[in-house]
UniProtKB/Swiss-Prot annotation:
Protein name, entry field: Fusion glycoprotein F0
Signal sequence segment: 1-23
TM stretches of this protein: 488-518
Positions bearing carbohydrate: 29, 61, 67
Coiled coil (residue ranges): 138-166, 462-487
Region (HRC): 69-95
């Protein structure tokens, strides 16, 4: 009984030590042909955005300073008009070409709002982003009453940052850039400073504020229809505290970084008031949705040698797994961080069955291609072990000073601390850890996949050969076309006469040929009979004279 328990324990220990595939990708078999995974992360997609209105009041309330700051305020208003009027004209050009579409209900004969139509003929040239932004502008046109109420509220407030909540609507954040300076610096010192000095200080502060607005909100001011907002502008608009965005939307620090790097936060100017000097922006914060069960893996490859030829395995740079399914992953719209992968759109698309078999451990399904020049990695560090193609680069044990030679029967060398604690490869010194990969991968034990050509030089050469062959085929086709055209030039009656003459010649010539053949055969038979007479008689014992007479 004890023996059975020991055998079972040993069997379970062996099973636990075997290298098994994780996440449907057989990293053990892939490492034999130089493919390793260098990272995995969760998968998040940006979905429907939540919007917040941001109002920037460029003109502060200076009721108590009117007598001392008239010249500075007049100059500041002139500067603001040079910025705001072009933006207003651009917004008007878009909003004037948008009209609502109303439908008539079947049960009740009244009109209701159904959507908007963009007058493309009158608008001229517009990008897709500008058209989308134009539709969003129409929503701000419907909120004109709310904007009027907002203007009235801001005329009387002296707060630098104020949250105004409209009835039944979202919160609107109002920002007045220099109001704190006026409230805390200029007004308390009115009795100590002269009127000219107060005006000069306010003028310098307004000019600095004007410069900050141009630099921070530059993209929105240059392209008011479709623009993006920077992290600096967002922080400035929220009073210098970016944590307000995190608290409001429930973002983590990594999520916000991913959204900013992928340009997920959009800010569009929806309204400009040149009388009250207001800019209304609509800021869209996307919502992140984590796709449960989807893991994004990054793959890297190392070249390997078969004799004097250097190869590498062709696999995608990124793949995704979900259960048993393995999918391709388009990283063009994604941002990669240690906390996860954030994509602005769905990046998954189907993978061919042959490539799935390759990633599941069937090395004979993995295509390979020749290395061109210095292309490709020749060593990589994975799980503390160094996987190197020591047949193409110099591998040296830094601890002992000896050269690490690669057996010709091996395609790669796996170096761990039991072999050499410190390795120098291609001029780089690396300290390796305990062994995680077996250094017993021989060529005759691996089923390699089919070779393919992917190098730019080969593709160009093959393309040139194909073009040359097409040119030759074109010349042959042109010559055949000339023959066909010459044949078409003959009349149909001539062709009929030629066919009749050929048939008559055949009818006359065939019997004559048969007669000639028979005559020649008869002559040959007579010549054979004369040259070969019958058997000679036995002349033994006959006299010579008789023989002569014969």
């Amino acid at each position: 009984m004890g023996l059975k328990v020991n055998v079972s324990a040993i069997f379970m220990a062996v099973l636990l030590t075997l290298q098994t595939p994780t996440g449907q990708i057989h990293w053990g078999n892939l490492s034999k042909i130089g493919v390793v995974g260098i990272g995995s992360a969760s998968y998040k997609v940006m979905t429907r955005s939540s919007h917040q209105s941001l109002v920037i009041k460029l003109m502060p309330n200076i009721t108590l300073l009117n007598n001392c700051t008239r010249v500075e305020i007049a100059e500041y208003r002139r500067l603001l008009r040079t910025v705001l009027e072009p933006i207003r004209d651009a917004l008007n050009a878009m909003t004037q070409n948008i009209r609502p579409v109303q439908s008539v209900a079947s049960s009740r004969r009244h009109k209701r709002f159904a959507g908007v139509v963009l007058a493309g003929a009158a608008l001229g040239v517009a990008t897709a982003a500008q058209i989308t932004a134009g539709i969003a502008l129409h929503q701000s046109m419907l909120n004109s009453q709310a904007i009027d109420n907002l203007r009235a509220s801001l005329e009387t407030t002296n707060q630098a940052i104020e949250a105004i909540r409209q009835a039944g609507q979202e919160m609107i954040l109002a920002v007045q850039g220099v109001q704190d300076y006026i409230n805390n610096e200029l007004i308390p010192s009115m009795n100590q400073l002269s009127c000219d000095l107060i005006g000069q200080k306010l003028g310098l502060k307004l000019l600095r504020y004007y410069t900050e607005i141009l630099s921070l909100f530059g993209p929105s001011l240059r392209d008011p229809i479709s623009a993006e907002i920077s992290i600096q502008a967002l922080s400035y608009a929220l009073g210098g505290d970016i944590n307000k965005v995190l608290e409001k939307l429930g973002y983590s620090g990594g999520d916000l970084l991913g959204i900013l790097e992928s340009r997920g936060i959009k800010a569009r100017i929806t309204h400009v008031d040149t009388e009250s000097y207001l800019i209304v922006l609509s800021i869209a914060y996307p919502t992140l949705s984590e796709i449960k069960g989807v893991i994004v893996h990054r793959l890297e490859g190392v070249s390997y040698n078969i004799g004097s030829q250097e190869w590498y395995t062709t696999v995608p740079k990124y793949v995704a797994t979900q259960g048993y399914l393995i999918s391709n992953f388009d990283e063009s719209s994604c941002t990669f961080m240690p906390e996860g992968t954030v994509c602005s759109q769905n990046a998954l698309y189907p993978m061919s069955p042959l490539l799935q078999e390759c990633l599941r451990g069937s090395t004979k399904s993995c295509a390979r291609t020749l290395v061109s020049g210095s292309f490709g990695n020749r060593f990589i560090l994975s799980q503390g072990n160094l996987i190197a193609n020591c047949a193409s680069i110099l591998c040296k044990c830094y601890t002992t000073g000896t050269i690490i030679n690669q057996d010709p029967d091996k395609i790669l060398t796996y170096i761990a601390a039991d072999h050499c604690p410190v390795v120098e490869v291609n001029g780089v010194t690396i300290q390796v850890g305990s062994r995680r990969y077996p250094d017993a991968v021989y060529l005759h034990r691996i089923d390699l996949g089919p070779p393919i050509l992917l190098e730019r030089l080969d593709v160009g050469t093959n393309l040139g050969n194909a073009i040359a062959k097409l040119e030759d085929a074109k010349e042959l086709l042109e010559s055949s076309d000339q023959i066909l055209r010459s044949m078409k030039g003959l009349s149909s009656t001539c062709i009929v006469y030629i066919l009749i003459a050929v048939c008559l010649g055949g009818l006359i010539g065939i019997p004559a040929l048969i007669c000639c053949c028979r005559g020649r055969c008869n002559k040959k038979g007579e010549q054979v009979g004369m040259s070969r007479p019958g058997l000679k008689p036995d002349l033994t014992g006959t006299s010579k004279s008789y023989v002569r007479s014969l």
